[in-house]
Amino acid sequence: MIIGITASCFDLCHAGHLEMLKYCKKHCDYLIVMLQTDPSIDRPDTKRKPIETVFERYIRLKNCKWVDEIIPYDTEKDLENALKVLEYDIRFLGEEYENKNFTGRYIPGHLEKCHFNPRKHSFSSTNLIERIKSLKEKI
């Protein structure tokens, strides 16, 4: 059995999240989703606080047919520790991380397990928020 793992905040779950989860599950038998509670905890300059609670995001992921297990985590250090302890065969990351410094990159043997999935769309939580803001201004 091939075990895959991916990590994100999954705030305002949108089409891009679903395409990514579907892609991950297509390449593994069992998919573990690491759910970040709040990325602004240790990256306040680059990440925003989630709009949805971790429980709302958990419920949505729990009901997604491509997700087999959900593990919440708080910080990037928590994620790194999980990557060191959990057993998995493939870690899925977006292709935009391939040449970047990402959590877990320097764990011995980890980079060989990384699969950088293609992003063939422009869906994002940031774009969704901007669209909602522009609609609100028109009301």
Task: Name each model feature, range by range.
Residues 1-139:
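Nucleotidyltransferase catalytic core that binds NTPs
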